[in-house]
């Protein structure tokens, strides 16, 4: 029964998140009870769930095909930050929105990318390998790249960002991984209900950010939506074209496209709140990306699965 509910929620995740985001935007009073201070804890819950699904075999891929994984990771932390920076400057965003967009770009790949790669008939092993390594590199690369791109605009506390990523991402994933390693036969049963927990947590994060910034989103939202959509779609395109340039097999092209285009926008939202507490609107791009990339990911999977 739980698995059926989880499957249904996972299938309609994009619609659920979109509906809640719309409610929070147009009737913010319905979601103001969800505090923005909960965001870190909700993201920790999602990351813990990700850890429960990881196994040693997921990391074996890194050692068997290090070139593929490292190439993908290098592309991830180069293409998306530069796209974010260029789009932010092109649209002349204010400091808060620029910080938020760049944080989306400098964060690692999204946790849903593995599922989208599977649905696209892409190289799932490469996708999982990239997600795992990108996430482990995030405490070092996300603050460093953010500092390089933003230091002349706003103050960036690199040490605070490092600590926040370790606390919110690495520790929960590591704890989940260890528990899965020790009590695997029990965690497999728990894993059936993880989509329910993850979707609920992500939905609450989006609702909190949107409802508490509804007025400002209504004033500047159109520009942010355009940038988020362009950032995501250009990321997909750049990832696929990189695969074409390197003459990779089609499944690898699909994995690269999805891994590069989809970002851990929940982490971007969390970091925006902790790293830039005086820039409230910095949390908005991550929240909008959370809504959009679930929609675009589903559409892309439906398209790419037909590409042979």
Q: What do the predicted segments below correspond to?
A:
Residues 1-308:
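Alpha-helical transmembrane segments of multi-pass small-molecule/ion transporters
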């Amino acid at each position: 029964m739980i698995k059926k509910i989880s499957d249904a929620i996972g299938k309609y995740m994009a619609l659920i998140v979109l509906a809640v985001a719309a409610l929070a935007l147009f009737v913010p009073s319905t979601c103001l009870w969800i505090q923005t201070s909960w965001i870190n804890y909700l993201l920790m819950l999602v990351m813990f769930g990700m850890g429960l699904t990881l196994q040693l075999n997921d990391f074996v891929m890194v050692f068997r095909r290090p070139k593929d994984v490292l190439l993908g990771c290098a592309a991830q932390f180069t293409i998306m930050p530069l796209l974010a920076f260029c789009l932010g400057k092109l649209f002349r965003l204010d400091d808060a929105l620029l910080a938020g967009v760049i944080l989306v770009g400098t964060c690692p790949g999204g946790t849903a990318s593995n599922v989208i790669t599977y649905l696209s008939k892409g190289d799932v092993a490469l996708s999982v390998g990239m997600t795992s390594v990108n996430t482990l590199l995030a405490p070092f690369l996300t603050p460093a790249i953010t500092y390089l791109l933003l230091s002349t605009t706003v103050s960036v506390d690199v040490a605070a960002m490092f600590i926040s990523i370790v606390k919110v991402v690495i520790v929960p994933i590591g704890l989940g991984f260890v528990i899965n390693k020790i009590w695997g036969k029990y965690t497999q049963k728990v894993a059936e209900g993880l989509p329910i927990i993850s979707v609920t947590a992500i939905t609450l994060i989006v609702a909190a950010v949107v409802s508490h910034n509804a007025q400002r989103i209504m004033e500047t939202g159109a520009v942010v939506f355009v940038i988020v959509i362009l950032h995501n779609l250009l990321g997909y395109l750049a990832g696929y074209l990189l695969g074409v340039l390197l003459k990779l097999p089609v499944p690898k092209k699909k994995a690269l496209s999805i891994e590069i285009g989809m970002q851990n926008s929940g982490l971007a939202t969390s970091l925006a709140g902790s790293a830039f507490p005086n820039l409230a609107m910095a949390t908005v791009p991550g929240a909008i990306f959370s809504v959009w990339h679930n929609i675009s990911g589903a559409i892309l999977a439906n398209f790419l699965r037909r590409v042979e």
